[in-house]
Amino acid sequence: MKFLLVFALALATTSAFQHPASIFELREGRIINGYEAYTGLFPYQAGLDITLQDQRRVWCGGSLIDNKWILTAAHCVHDAVSVVVYLGSAVQYEGEAVVNSERIISHSMFNPDTYLNDVALIKIPHVEYTDNIQPIRLPSGEELNNKFENIWATVSGWGQSNTDTVILQYTYNLVIDNDRCAQEYPPGIIVESTICGDTCDGKSPCFGDSGGPFVLSDKNLLIGVVSFVSGAGCESGKPVGFSRVTSYMDWIQQNTGIIF
């Protein structure tokens, strides 16, 4: 599946990082070289059909964190007027529950040039939990101080290997330290609130996987939100950037009222 944001046009330097040509281009796309999931494998996975102010529609991923809240990327809902949320199915545009957004909250300090603070919340009507619809756990206690380096985590989204697919895809990326990750980006892009994943094996998120979950599967723990890849391309082997969930727990609690 191709994940997220490829920074398309130019710093007009030798830098691999590029500013996005448009938010639309960053959100449409798929996971690369992933594996096919089945319904119920990732019961927290949300599919987001987003309508923008100019009536264009884009697709992103998200994570169910409560029966009324979805966590996603701010760049996904930039200029959004409404979101249709699909839950409980591995098939794109299908869901055991299909609901309309009630409220969209982007981080007030989101920077569309650097993708700093690239997190957003979507409030939805109450959904009932089932075998195929379950919330993902968020960090708490000592986990809030954990950088999760050198641990494999799972990223999922509706992607493509070599062909278009409507089936949820997933792959694994190794969490790497930010100093190593920062070597591949200009100064100021990789910050404390970024968590990076290695993609040197050719498996990466890309367009359309934006906002999706980055999860420690053995702990059912959400550690990242898909945010960006290098302007060199999704298959370049450059690290992928996620918004670090531990950096935003206070913000999530303040805006949802949920105590995790």
Swiss-Prot record:
<comment type="similarity">
    <text>Belongs to the peptidase S1 family.</text>
</comment>
<comment type="function">
    <text>This enzyme is a serine protease capable of degrading the native triple helix of collagen. Also cleaves the B chain of insulin at the 15-Leu-|-Try-16 and 22-Arg-|-Gly-23 bonds. Hydrolyzes casein, but not Px-Pro-Leu-Gly-Pro-DArg, BzArgNHPh, AcTyrNHPh, 2-naphthyl phosphate, 2-naphthyl butyrate, 2-naphthyl caprylate, 2-naphthyl myristate, L-leucine 2-2-naphthylamide, L-valine 2-naphthylamide, L-cysteine 2-naphthylamide or L-glutarylphenylalanine 2-naphthylamide.</text>
</comment>
<dbReference type="GO" id="GO:0005576">
    <property type="term" value="C:extracellular region"/>
</dbReference>
<dbReference type="GO" id="GO:0006508">
    <property type="term" value="P:proteolysis"/>
</dbReference>
<keyword id="KW-1015">Disulfide bond</keyword>
<feature type="propeptide">
    <location>
        <begin position="17"/>
        <end position="30"/>
    </location>
</feature>
<feature type="signal peptide">
    <location>
        <begin position="1"/>
        <end position="16"/>
    </location>
</feature>
<dbReference type="InterPro" id="IPR001254">
    <property type="entry name" value="Trypsin_dom"/>
</dbReference>
<dbReference type="InterPro" id="IPR050430">
    <property type="entry name" value="Peptidase_S1"/>
</dbReference>
<feature type="disulfide bond">
    <location>
        <begin position="60"/>
        <end position="76"/>
    </location>
</feature>
<dbReference type="InterPro" id="IPR009003">
    <property type="entry name" value="Peptidase_S1_PA"/>
</dbReference>
<keyword id="KW-0378">Hydrolase</keyword>
<feature type="disulfide bond">
    <location>
        <begin position="206"/>
        <end position="234"/>
    </location>
</feature>
<dbReference type="InterPro" id="IPR033116">
    <property type="entry name" value="TRYPSIN_SER"/>
</dbReference>
<dbReference type="GO" id="GO:0004252">
    <property type="term" value="F:serine-type endopeptidase activity"/>
</dbReference>
<keyword id="KW-0865">Zymogen</keyword>
<dbReference type="GO" id="GO:0030574">
    <property type="term" value="P:collagen catabolic process"/>
</dbReference>
<protein>
    <recommendedName>
        <fullName>Collagenase</fullName>
        <ecNumber>3.4.21.49</ecNumber>
    </recommendedName>
</protein>
<keyword id="KW-0732">Signal</keyword>
<feature type="active site" description="Charge relay system">
    <location>
        <position position="118"/>
    </location>
</feature>
<dbReference type="Pfam" id="PF00089">
    <property type="entry name" value="Trypsin"/>
</dbReference>
<dbReference type="InterPro" id="IPR001314">
    <property type="entry name" value="Peptidase_S1A"/>
</dbReference>
<keyword id="KW-0720">Serine protease</keyword>
<dbReference type="InterPro" id="IPR043504">
    <property type="entry name" value="Peptidase_S1_PA_chymotrypsin"/>
</dbReference>
<keyword id="KW-0645">Protease</keyword>
<feature type="disulfide bond">
    <location>
        <begin position="181"/>
        <end position="196"/>
    </location>
</feature>
<feature type="active site" description="Charge relay system">
    <location>
        <position position="210"/>
    </location>
</feature>
<feature type="domain" description="Peptidase S1">
    <location>
        <begin position="31"/>
        <end position="257"/>
    </location>
</feature>
<dbReference type="InterPro" id="IPR018114">
    <property type="entry name" value="TRYPSIN_HIS"/>
</dbReference>
<keyword id="KW-0177">Collagen degradation</keyword>
<keyword id="KW-0964">Secreted</keyword>
<feature type="active site" description="Charge relay system">
    <location>
        <position position="75"/>
    </location>
</feature>
